A protein has these predicted regions:
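12-transmembrane solute porter fold
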Residues: 10-26, 31-33, 46, 52, ...
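Interfacial helix-loop-helix linkers and transmembrane-helix boundary segments
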Residues: 71-78, 134-136, 191-199, 253-256, ...
């Protein structure tokens, strides 16, 4: 292929995959600043609002690696188009939802589409870009995804205020319809290794996580000792235990448990899950606090959250450079500690009528902490496994982040419902403060977990005993 044609193909691949990933990443948090308007328009209790977030994150998380495997087997472009079609159609269905149950169902289908689309977008881009320009392309791709996450609350707030909440979903439809013919024409079909599809593993983890999250979300409404809640907790836990044994026995499992033999891999993934648990649950409540208690408009609420959500765009590149010099472990641990301090600061200062100036330090500290986490955490994940396993490791980490987010909304929502409610500003604060302390504690535990990640061995040294030869060829996770 001529050089100019190759450049054009790579540019088109970046535009198409970047736009698709922007939509999928945006929909993680775009709904948060629209929640008060959705509640006012469609009704629904706290648990219904939690499901508008969790229906997306759960299906996204549990099907992420399965979607990548489908693409490898049946064609990456073909499945990318399938995921994009599902996501676009579900976005239209969400916008047209006549009630809260229909919206939750549409959000779940959105998550299915995103889970197929997202991993294949990265694979298609990598294949389309020449090796000498791949780093720059992947950097732009990562920046686009980060911008989508950061701008989610602002975009959601602005569309809700100036149009209505359904426009946060209508936004995806013209973009998706434009991308479908472009992807068909401009992306090349490719296949991966013909690995077996782990359908049993996907069913086990999907049902297990659904049972636990369902129980947590409905515990306060139904009672912690109700049959449905107890069944959800026990059945969900049993299914997740079965998923672990399945991963131990099947070498081609969706999430091979052999990866967790690496203390570095286990540590960074545990820290990631806890970090997203605290962050997602806190954003879920604080975005409603800014509007429902302090009286900010949706746009004003989104703007006021930018010091937190947008700070990683500035801090992450610097954190990446620093981690290359001193190792990822201290940078990640420091970032998580700052995030925990920021959430604790929120818990100390929020009250009905609290000034924004009192909240601003917490927002900035949390944003800096989040930015210090992202780039070094990705590096720690990749360096904790062998090169041949990096694709699986990255997918597992992304899935566990989404699981953490879903659990965070469920757990912090349960604490909020037990201690407060929507009856008044005081009631909302009564529920939010203990929930924020739980979120802060989860992120603090993540910081301690990050400190336990093993340090880097001196280059060329190997552990004694079996596998020493292999260790010489592979350097474990950075300090």
């Amino acid at each position: 292929m001529p050089q100019s044609a190759a450049r054009g193909s790579a540019a088109w691949a970046l535009v198409i995959t970047g736009a698709a990933s922007f939509m999928a990443a945006l929909d993680n948090l775009v709904v948060t600043t629209a929640l008060p308007s959705i509640r006012e328009d469609l009704g629904g209790a706290l648990e219904d609002l939690e499901w508008t977030v969790n229906a997306y994150t759960l299906t996204f998380a549990v099907l992420l690696m399965f979607g990548a495997a489908l693409g490898d087997r049946f064609g990456r472009r073909r499945l990318f188009l399938t995921g994009l079609t599902i996501f676009t159609g579900a976005s239209a269905a969400a916008a047209l939802s006549p009630g809260i149950d229909a919206l939750i169902a549409a959000r779940a289908v959105q998550g299915v589409g995103a889970a197929i689309m997202m991993p294949l977008a990265l694979t298609l881009l990598t294949a389309a870009v020449p090796a000498e320009r791949r780093g720059a392309a992947l950097g732009i791709f990562g920046a686009i995804t980060g911008l989508a996450v950061a701008s989610g609350p602002l975009v959601g707030g602005s569309l809700t205020e100036h149009f209505s909440w359904d426009w946060i979903f209508w936004l995806n439809v013209p973009i998706g319809l434009a991308l479908l013919p472009l992807a068909r024409l401009r992306l090349k079909e490719s296949h991966g290794p013909g690995a077996r599809l782990d359908v049993p593993g996907t069913v086990l983890i999907s049902a297990g996580l659904f049972g636990i999250v369902y129980a947590l979300v409905n515990a306060n409404a139904d009672g912690w000792t109700s049959a449905t809640v107890l069944l959800g907790l026990f059945a969900g836990t049993a299914l997740l235990v079965a998923f672990v044994f399945h991963g131990l026995r099947r070498p081609d499992a969706m999430l091979p448990m052999r990866l967790f033999a690496s203390r570095a891999f286990t540590g960074i993934n545990a820290a990631s899950l806890l970090m997203f648990l605290g962050m997602f649950g806190s954003i879920f409540l604080l975005s409603q606090f800014l509007q429902g208690v302090l009286g900010y408009s949706p746009t004003e609420a989104g703007v006021r959250m930018l010091p937190w959500t947008a700070m990683p765009l500035l801090v992450s590149p610097i954190a990446g450079v620093v981690s290359d010099r001193i190792g990822g472990r201290p940078v990640v641990a420091t970032g998580l500690a700052l995030q925990a301090i920021g959430l604790g600061w929120f818990a100390l200062v929020i009250e009905p009528g609290v000034a924004y100036s009192a909240q601003l330090p917490a927002l900035i500290i949390s944003g800096i902490g989040m930015g210090m986490y992202f780039a070094p955490a990705a590096s720690l994940v990749m360096s904790s496994v062998r090169p041949a396993e990096q694709g699986i490791a990255s997918g597992a980490n992304n899935a566990l982040r989404e699981v953490g987010g879903a659990l965070g909304v469920a757990i912090l929502g349960a604490v909020f419902a037990a201690q407060g409610g929507y009856e008044s500003g005081d009631a909302f604060v009564d529920g939010t403060v203990p929930a924020l302390w739980i979120g802060s504690g989860a992120v603090a535990l993540a910081a301690l977990t990050a400190l336990l990640i093993p340090g880097r061995r001196a280059r060329g040294t190997a552990p004694a005993g079996e596998g020493a030869k292999e260790a010489k060829e592979y350097e474990p996770a950075a300090a």
